[in-house]
Every structure is written in structure tokens, then in C-alpha cells.
């Protein structure tokens, strides 16, 4: 499987700006979506930046107890330990009645799935945004070389079979066929389990966390819990 075409890769950043501009247009409508009337915590895990602030604030507007992952920049396994990441869940579990939903952008979605696999009893659901957990992901991403440079030691998380196995909780994979960073096929969850859903949106990879359609689907899926 090949990485996205170079035209998609080179245009992903500019298209992310367009995603953010469209979000401003649709923001008034998104803010009118029903607010939750239940205790429900959400942790948002980043890709490789700290651009999840607007999404977190939007989820708080809808009544969710939402936070980032509180581990700094996500540069791969060196950015955190499993203990530090799971311990960051504790205050959210207390605020959310014992469970939390996880939303992960790109690499953050892979770690969200991993957390759900380790502690499924504490996870409502997992929503991934352009996360390359599918088979062949290492060869199908323009970010692979940078990731390997930052994380030279082999990591068990890189195993195709273990990554592609869905966690034992409801899982939604949001993807875009115009993804300029990873081959969109690696962001799909295979299988026909009723707890697994793949949702296509139009947009860039970088801008998935600032995409109006993505915000709509996140709000919809969280409300279903």
C-alpha cells in the first residue's frame, strides 16, 4: 500500500486552513446541537500538535467534561508511559461516573484504542480521526520516516495485527479519502461487528480536528452513549 499522492500531501496544510474556515461558518449550527444532561467525560488525544483546544471547548459547551491528554506533544511512545496516560484518566473517571470516552486524532487515535484495550471497563467508546491502525500503515504514511527518527527503538504498538484489532468497546473510525498524510484505507476498521463504524468526511488529515462534519459526528456519537 502506497502513501497518499504527493499532490494530496503538499496541499494538506492549505486544505486544513480551509477546514478551519468552514468550521467558523458552521459553528453557530454546531453549537445548537443538543447538550448532554448526563455525567460524561471525554479525553481528546492529539496527533502531533496541540490543536485540539477548539474541539475541547466545543465539547465543554455541549456539557461534557472534556480535557486533553495532559502529556504534552505527541511524538510517539517516548512522549508518555502507559502509567502516566492511564493515571490521567482518573479525574475524568471520577467526573464521568466511572467511564470516559476517548477521541484521538491521527497517532492519538492509536493510543486511544490501546487504552481502551487495556481498560475497557472504564471506556464508553473510542472515536478516531484519520488514525492509521490498518494493515500496511507503516508503508502507507508520509509521516513514517519522521516517526521512526523520533522513535528509533522498535515498539510493540507498531505491529499491524495488534493495531488493527478493535478494542472491546464501541469504536468509530472517521476518515477522509483526501488524506494527505496517511493512506485513508489504513484508517478504516475492518470487520462487520455492530460496535464498529467507519464514517467518511471531506477534508484534510491535518484539519480533521477542526472539521465541521467531524465535530457533528463526534457530538452525535457521544450523545448515543
Task: Give residue spans per PLM region.
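Alpha/beta hydrolase fold serine-hydrolase catalytic domain that processes acyl esters and thioesters
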Residues: 1-22, 136, 140, 147-150, ...
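Flexible, membrane-associating and regulatory peripheral segments of lipid-active enzymes
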Residues: 1-43, 53-55, 62-67, 95
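Serine-dependent carboxylesterase/thioesterase catalytic core
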Residues: 38-47, 54, 60-69, 76-169, ...
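Short, solvent-exposed loop/turn segments at secondary-structure junctions
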Residues: 48-50, 133-134, 178-180, 204
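Short, surface-exposed alpha-helical segments at coil->helix boundaries
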Residues: 53-57, 184-185
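C-terminal catalytic-base region of ester-bond hydrolases, centering on the histidine
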Residues: 167-225
Amino acid at each position: 500500500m502506497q502513501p497518499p499522492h504527493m499532490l494530496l500531501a503538499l496541499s494538506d496544510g492549505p486544505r486544513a486552513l480551509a477546514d478551519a474556515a468552514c468550521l467558523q461558518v458552521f459553528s453557530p449550527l454546531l453549537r445548537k446541537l443538543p447538550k448532554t444532561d448526563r455525567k460524561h467525560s471525554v479525553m481528546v488525544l492529539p496527533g502531533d500538535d496541540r490543536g485540539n483546544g477548539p474541539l475541547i471547548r466545543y465539547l465543554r459547551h455541549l456539557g461534557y467534561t472534556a480535557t486533553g491528554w495532559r502529556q504534552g506533544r505527541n511524538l510517539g511512545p517516548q512522549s508518555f508511559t502507559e502509567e502516566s496516560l492511564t493515571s490521567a484518566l482518573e479525574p475524568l473517571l471520577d467526573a464521568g461516573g466511572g467511564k470516559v470516552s476517548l477521541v484521538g486524532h491521527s497517532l492519538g487515535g492509536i493510543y486511544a484504542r490501546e487504552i481502551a484495550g487495556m481498560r475497557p471497563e472504564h471506556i464508553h467508546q473510542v472515536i478516531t480521526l484519520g488514525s492509521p491502525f490498518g494493515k500496511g500503515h507503516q508503508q502507507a504514511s508520509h509521516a513514517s520516516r519522521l516517526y521512526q527518527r523520533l522513535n528509533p527503538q522498535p515498539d510493540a504498538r507498531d505491529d499491524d495485527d495488534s493495531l488493527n484489532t478493535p478494542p472491546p468497546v464501541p469504536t468509530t473510525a472517521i476518515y477522509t479519502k483526501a488524506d494527505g498524510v496517511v493512506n485513508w484505507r489504513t484508517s478504516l476498521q475492518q470487520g462487520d461487528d455492530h460496535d464498529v463504524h467507519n464514517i467518511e468526511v471531506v477534508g484534510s488529515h491535518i484539519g480533521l480536528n477542526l472539521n465541521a462534519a467531524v465535530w457533528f459526528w463526534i457530538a452525535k456519537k457521544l450523545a448515543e452513549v
